[in-house]
Swiss-Prot record:
Biological process according to GO: chromatin remodeling; regulation of transcription by RNA polymerase II
Keywords linked to the UniProt accession: Activator, Chromatin regulator, Metal-binding, Nucleus, Transcription, Transcription regulation, Zinc, Zinc-finger
Protein's UniProt name: SAGA-associated factor 11
Pfam families named among the record's database cross-references: Sgf11, Sgf11_N
Source organism per UniProt: Candida glabrata (strain ATCC 2001 / BCRC 20586 / JCM 3761 / NBRC 0622 / NRRL Y-65 / CBS 138) (Yeast)
Gene for this chain: SGF11
Main location: nucleus
Lineage, broadest ranks: Eukaryota, Fungi, Dikarya, Ascomycota, Saccharomycotina
Amino acid sequence: MTEQHETIQSVTDGIYNNLVTSMIHSIVSKETAREKLLRSRYGSYKQYHYDPNSQLDIHGNPKQQDSSQYFYCENCGREVSGNRFAAHLQRCLTRGSRR
């Protein structure tokens, strides 16, 4: 009886292992095909840079202060600081519509 029990156990283990292995192979092949499709559409992606000191941006470049960036206002022709650009546009556009 024990030999028959061991044989049944080994057969069931083999069937179970084959099922699990085929499921894993199926999942891996589907995900590999999906990954290849995504890479062919969008190319490979570049990892973002992580700086624990917050001195660099996500691309690894030194951070710039908003006040050091200036933008050109198309409406009035002035250069405006980046941290004041939204407020300037609101004033500039409402002032221009009153004239």
